[in-house]
Structures are given as C-alpha cells and as structure tokens.
Curated annotation (Swiss-Prot):
Classification via PANTHER family: 30S RIBOSOMAL PROTEIN S2 PROKARYOTIC AND ORGANELLAR, SMALL RIBOSOMAL SUBUNIT PROTEIN US2M
Quaternary structure annotation from Swiss-Prot or TrEMBL: Part of the 30S ribosomal subunit. Contacts protein S8 and may contact the N-terminus of Era.
PROSITE patterns: RIBOSOMAL_S2_1
Protein name: Small ribosomal subunit protein uS2
Keyword Ribosomal protein found: yes
Gene name as annotated: rpsB
Entry coiled-coil feature ranges: 104-149
Annotated CDD domains: RPS2
Listed Pfam families: Ribosomal_S2
UniProt source species: Thermus thermophilus (strain ATCC 27634 / DSM 579 / HB8)
Length: 256
C-alpha cells in the first residue's frame, strides 16, 4: 500500500479540527485528543491508525474489482466527491440523497432508465416533433434526473461499500447501507457516532482541504490497486480556490 498520508499533511489540511464541544457525540470520545477554546481536537495518531485500516480495506476491494459509492451532499464536499469519484470511475451522489437509493434500488434504477430514454430523445430529431409545451416539460424532467442521478447511473448493482463525507448529514444513506449489510466508510467529525460506521476516518468533514486530502488519497489507492497510473488530482484546484477566498481571520468563506 504505497499511497500514504503523513501527520504533517493531516495537520496542514486541518484534519484535526473538530466541532464545538456542545455539538459533540460522546461516543466519539476515544478519538478526541483535547479541547481548546471550546473546540475538540481530534487525535491524529488515532486517525493514522484508522486510515491504515480503512485504506487496506479499500485497496483489497479495488483489487477485487469492487464498487464504492461515494456520497457527499454538503456544499463543500459536492465538487470534490464528483471529481474524485469520476477519477476513480466510481458512482457518486453529491446532490440530495433520494430515499431508497439502496433499499429500493430497483425503482431508482427505473428512474435511471427514464433518464437514458430522455437523453436519447433529446439527441434525436424526434424531440422537434413534440409540442413545445411537452418539450419544456420533458426538458425539466431531464434536468432534474440529471441533477440527482448523473453520478448514480454508473451503479448497475448494489455497491460493495459506500464512502460518505459526514455520516451525520448522510444519515439516511448510512442507515440504508447498514440495513443491507453494505460496509460504510466515512470521514467522520466529532459529532458522529462511530458505531454506525464500519471503517471510520476520524477527521474534519467540513473543511475543503481535509475532504480533498482524504478522498484524493483514497482514490489514488483505488487507481493504483487496479494497475492504473496515479496523476495529480484536479480537485486540488478547489483547495487553491478556497485559499484564495480566505478571510483575514484565516477561515475560508466556502468552509464557513
């Protein structure tokens, strides 16, 4: 497993910054190092230990040709989730999680089929034969399906695992995966319940730098495990954009 993350990189990405104490989940206590100014600090040695365990699982799954569904619908995770999942050739959900995406997979797959039907229709001359009012209605339907299912459409069967950014926000996705005994990987902050996650990466799940570092290295590992060539991730540009919009206090406007 040559892909590695150092403690220095974790520190620079702010992975150690948790939430305010008033927002913590007591079950997360074993991953907390200290409290400073009312903010919990995550123990990066514990993060490193869990990263090694989690990355070994991801590597093994990738080598066996397994599929990981990436899930991250919060604003600061959306673009990173999309870019990294696409880089890995994996399905993703970065808009709203539609209830039943896993537990009612057959019905959701029918919506994907509808999406493909509409795309084919709009790519053919037949669409011009439809009344204008119907064209507008179908276009609206197409855009909605594309928004919510563009990343999910790659999933032809239930995934072998899901990788969520913030299991508290993505509670429905986590609950559906657990119901179907699908392993849950998660970048989880101090407000999370570790007992709901099979492979936890204790860390800041709000900062763009933290999300990008963890997801890009996980995807590097997937690519490498499948015999591909790892190249610099284009999602790092999002980190640079965040740095360019930082306020004088050092807090990114995007991360706020």
């Amino acid at each position: 497993m040559p892909v590695e993350i150092t403690v220095k990189e974790l520190l620079e990405a702010g992975v150690h910054f948790g939430h305010e104490r008033k927002r913590w989940n007591p079950k997360f206590a074993r991953y907390i190092y200290a409290e400073r100014n009312g903010i919990h600090i995550i123990d990066l040695q514990k993060t490193m230990e869990e990263l090694e365990r989690t990355f070994r699982f991801i590597e093994d799954l990738a080598m066996r040709g397994g599929t990981i569904l990436f899930v991250g619908t919060k604003k600061q995770a959306q673009d990173i989730v999309r870019m990294e999942a696409e880089r890995a050739g994996m399905p993703y959900v970065n808009q709203r999680w539609l209830g039943g995406m896993l537990t009612n997979f057959k019905t959701i797959s029918q919506r994907v089929h509808r999406l493909e039907e509409l795309e084919a229709l709009f790519a053919s001359p037949e669409i011009e034969e439809r009344p204008k009012k119907e064209q507008v209605r179908l276009k609206h339907e197409l855009e909605r399906l594309q928004k919510y299912l563009s990343g999910f459409r790659l999933l032809k069967r239930l995934p072998d695992a899901i990788f969520v950014v913030d299991p508290t926000k993505e509670a429905i996705a986590v609950r559906e995966a657990r119901k179907l005994f699908i392993p849950v990987i998660a970048l989880a902050d101090t407000d999370s319940d570790p007992d709901l996650v099979d492979y936890i990466i204790p860390g800041n799940d709000d900062a763009i730098r933290s999300i990008q570092l963890i997801l890009s290295r996980a995807v590097d590992l997937i690519i490498q495990a499948r015999g591909g060539v790892v190249e610099p991730s284009p999602s790092y540009a999002l980190v640079q954009e965040a740095e360019a919009t930082e306020t004088p206090e050092g807090e990114s406007e995007v991360e706020a």
